[in-house]
From Swiss-Prot:
It comes from Streptococcus pneumoniae serotype 4 (strain ATCC BAA-334 / TIGR4). Gene3D superfamilies: 3.40.50.2020. Pathway: Purine metabolism; AMP biosynthesis via salvage pathway; AMP from adenine: step 1/1. Its EC number is 2.4.2.7. This is Adenine phosphoribosyltransferase. The gene is apt. Coiled coil: none annotated. GO terms for cellular component: cytoplasm.
């Protein structure tokens, strides 16, 4: 299945000069959505993962069905102030400044094999901060999986030597 057939391209959104890749049409098509999830489930199975971690918000949309299919847990990564219990945090650089991500301090058990699942790999800041938190909690990075990678932004460099799977490249 050519998943790119289910990605909408919007020029100059959210601002001039940006080409936005919208996964909404993929999610709206049950066959395409299911196919994408199954591809990541197979990757996760091969990696023998114990836990899925997904950054808000679209990481939830992709990561939760993967965790469900595998019968394993899902840990959300959120912006500050969105999680109700004790959290750890990691900062990451954005185009104009620094932002912070958090996750529950008990989300990952030491030794758990963790797969990060998100919709998009762009600059890699989000995934780098997420890796930092997983490792701080003693998790073992099994890999990362993304629906889309924007190749020209070189986000893969922030993943380092960790394995990753991408379903579509732009």
């Amino acid at each position: 299945m050519n998943l790119k057939d289910y990605i909408a391209t919007i020029e100059n959104y959210p601002k001039e000069g940006i080409t936005f890749r919208d996964i909404s049409p993929l999610m709206a098509d049950g066959n395409a959505y299911s196919y994408a999830v199954r591809e990541i489930v197979q990757y996760a199975t091969d990696k023998k993962v114990d836990m899925i971690v997904g950054p808000e918000a679209r990481g939830f949309i992709v990561g939760c069905p993967v965790a469900f299919e595998l019968g394993i847990g899902f840990a959300p990564v959120r912006k500050p102030g969105k999680l109700p219990r004790e959290v750890i945090s990691a900062d990451y650089e954005k185009e104009y400044g620094v932002d912070t991500l958090t996750m529950h301090a008990d989300a990952i058990k030491p030794g758990q094999r963790v797969l990060i699942v998100d919709d998009l790999l762009a600059t890699g800041g989000t995934v780098k901060a997420t890796i930092e938190m997983i490792e701080k909690l003693g998790g073992v990075m099994a890999g990362c999986a993304f629906l889309v990678e924007l190749d020209e932004l070189n986000g893969r460099e922030k993943i380092g030597d960790y394995d990753y799977k991408v379903l579509m490249h732009y």
